[in-house]
Regions:
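Gly/Ala-rich beta-loop-alpha elbow adjacent to hydrolase catalytic centers
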Residues: 91, 95, 99
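Catalytic histidine-centered segment of alpha/beta-hydrolase-like enzymes
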Residues: 229-242
Length: 255
């Protein structure tokens, strides 16, 4: 009998003040090469909410769970975190794919959602130069993780990270490889099957393909609408947490 995998690291923040959304629960799902703590600024803008965020399998505090075995395991992990409790869901980047797939299969637990620029590499026009279409696949996992991080945060930020942090991030390369591979096998969700209200967010400073994908995804979702933060890029939850929080409140109101 195989040993059970260790549990995912889950962060829970109870409301810190009274407000109109008292009792509202949100679950936050991070993207590739990220972790739950990247939502700290966003959580601070939702003081009257209960917030659950978790390190996805293979990252940060969940590194001991190992790389995901497939995309279905990502959805299963989200359902395990929810534990049969209904929540408004926010998914950033790859986390948006997880949220949409989860909403398609378990709309009773995710009644409404906000997703920010989820990759859609199964679309025929999706650029070959993106990681989700295989760019960097020839690198060793550790090197691909560093390559990915440098593309996301820039060389200067990467080189200023503490040595221990860079070692940890490089070690997450096997997880990155596994989840990017899962996106290369075909669509991980059927937009037509996502019947819940969804706000598809995009940044005014994001890449052309991310902006196009946001528009097309919002149109393909039965109850999808698009929202844009003009001065934001892909990392809007870090650069514009107040605006993302406002969109999450708007998503909750659509439930």
């Amino acid at each position: 009998m195989s040993e059970p995998s260790p549990p995912l690291r889950v962060l829970r923040r109870d409301p810190v003040c009274a407000g109109p959304a008292a009792g509202r629960l949100a679950v936050l799902v991070h993207g590739s090469m990220d972790r739950a703590t990247s939502f700290t600024r966003l959580m601070a803008r939702l003081p009257d909410w209960t917030i659950i965020a978790y390190d996805r399998r293979g990252y940060a505090g969940s590194s001991g769970t190992g790389p995901p075995l497939g995309f279905d395991q990502q959805v299963a992990d989200l359902m395990e975190v929810l534990d049969n409790t209904q929540a408004v869901a926010f998914g950033h980047s790859f986390g948006g794919d997880v949220v949409l797939a989860g909403a398609a299969s378990h709309p009773e637990l995710i009644p409404t959602a906000l997703v920010w620029e989820p990759p859609l590499p199964w679309l025929p026009w999706w650029p070959e130069t993106t990681a989700s279409r295989g760019a960097g696949a020839g690198l060793d996992p550790d090197d691909r993780a560093e390559w990915f991080m440098r593309r996301m945060v820039g060389d200067r930020v990467w080189e200023r990270l503490p040595s221990a942090t860079r070692v940890q991030r490089r070690a997450e390369g096997h997880t990155l490889q596994a989840e990017l591979r899962s996106l290369s096998l075909g669509a991980v969700f059927d937009a037509a099957a996502v019947r819940i209200p969804v706000i598809v967010g995009r940044g005014g400073k994001s890449s052309v393909h991310q902006r196009r994908a946001g528009r097309e995804l919002a149109a393909a979702l039965p109850a999808g609408i698009m929202a844009e933060i003009a001065d934001a890029g892909h990392g809007a939850h870090l650069s514009h947490p107040a605006e993302v929080a406002a969109l999450l409140r708007q998503a909750a109101a659509r439930a």
